[in-house]
């Protein structure tokens, strides 16, 4: 199974493509950062994210897309812009025929490190360890995206029975805790 993990942002969007069986043999196929110029209009930046991710989907043909849910801070304009980026990514996934699943940051951290409140440095270290990378990818947007892909593989990507999203709602939590336990017996105490 191949999963494209995305950490969306209006100025920097991290992506990570990971293959794996949902248990322990994970491999990073590609990762990087779509860095956007802040002086370009927001519409142009959203279009660039769509275009670059579309090329990536066409090239690597992931089975699934996993996206981190939005963190809503105090800045309403930032939240709106992030929502537009996420909407473009969801539309791209739908247009490409690739199911999309959402995971909260705490869920990603818990899947990768065992702690929902883990620091970004801990997530980055564990991502590099799980993917047998010689160094930790930078910046955190990239390791977060790889973590989202790993979370999806650990939660639902191990060939376990799962409910497929109909693209009308988010996919987060579709597999459930029971599927995670069955897919990852070595991670449960």
UniProtKB/Swiss-Prot annotation:
EC number(s) reported in the record: 3.1.21.10
Active site (catalytic residues): 7, 68, 141
Top-rank EC class of the record's enzyme: hydrolase
Swiss-Prot/TrEMBL cofactor(s): Mg(2+)
Binding site for Mg(2+) 1: 7, 141
Protein's name in the database: Crossover junction endodeoxyribonuclease RuvC
Catalytic activity: Endonucleolytic cleavage at a junction such as a reciprocal single-stranded crossover between two homologous DNA duplexes (Holliday junction)
Compartments reported by the entry: Cytoplasm
Any GO BP annotation: DNA repair
Binding site for Mg(2+) 2: 68
Entry keywords, A to Z: Cytoplasm, DNA damage, DNA recombination, DNA repair, DNA-binding, Endonuclease, Hydrolase, Magnesium, Metal-binding, Nuclease
Coiled-coil positions: none
Record note on cofactor: Binds 2 Mg(2+) ion per subunit.
Subunit structure: Homodimer which binds Holliday junction (HJ) DNA. The HJ becomes 2-fold symmetrical on binding to RuvC with unstacked arms; it has a different conformation from HJ DNA in complex with RuvA. In the full resolvosome a probable DNA-RuvA(4)-RuvB(12)-RuvC(2) complex forms which resolves the HJ.
Described function: The RuvA-RuvB-RuvC complex processes Holliday junction (HJ) DNA during genetic recombination and DNA repair. Endonuclease that resolves HJ intermediates. Cleaves cruciform DNA by making single-stranded nicks across the HJ at symmetrical positions within the homologous arms, yielding a 5'-phosphate and a 3'-hydroxyl group; requires a central core of homology in the junction. The consensus cleavage sequence is 5'-(A/T)TT(C/G)-3'. Cleavage occurs on the 3'-side of the TT dinucleotide at the point of strand exchange.
Organism name: Chlorobium phaeovibrioides (strain DSM 265 / 1930) (Prosthecochloris vibrioformis (strain DSM 265))
NCBIfam families linked: ruvC
């Amino acid at each position: 199974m191949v999963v494209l993990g995305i950490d969306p942002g209006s100025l920097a969007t991290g992506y990570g493509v990971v293959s794996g069986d949902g248990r322990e043999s994970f491999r990073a196929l590609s990762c990087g950062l779509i860095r956007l110029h802040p002086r370009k209009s927001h519409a142009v930046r959203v279009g660039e994210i769509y275009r670059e991710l579309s090329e990536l989907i066409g090239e690597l043909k992931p089975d699934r897309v996993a996206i981190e849910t939005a963190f809503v801070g105090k800045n309403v304009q930032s939240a709106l812009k992030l929502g537009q980026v996420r909407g473009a990514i969801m539309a791209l996934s739908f247009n490409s025929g690739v199911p999309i699943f959402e995971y909260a940051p705490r869920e990603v951290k818990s899947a990768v490190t065992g702690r929902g409140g883990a620091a970004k440095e801990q997530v980055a270290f564990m991502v590099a360890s799980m993917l047998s990378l010689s160094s930790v990818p930078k910046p955190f947007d990239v390791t977060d995206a790889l973590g989202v892909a790993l979370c999806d593989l650990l939660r639902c990507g191990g060939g376990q029975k799962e409910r497929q999203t109909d693209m009308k709602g988010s996919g987060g939590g579709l597999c459930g805790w029971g599927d995670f336990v069955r897919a990852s017996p070595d991670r449960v105490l």
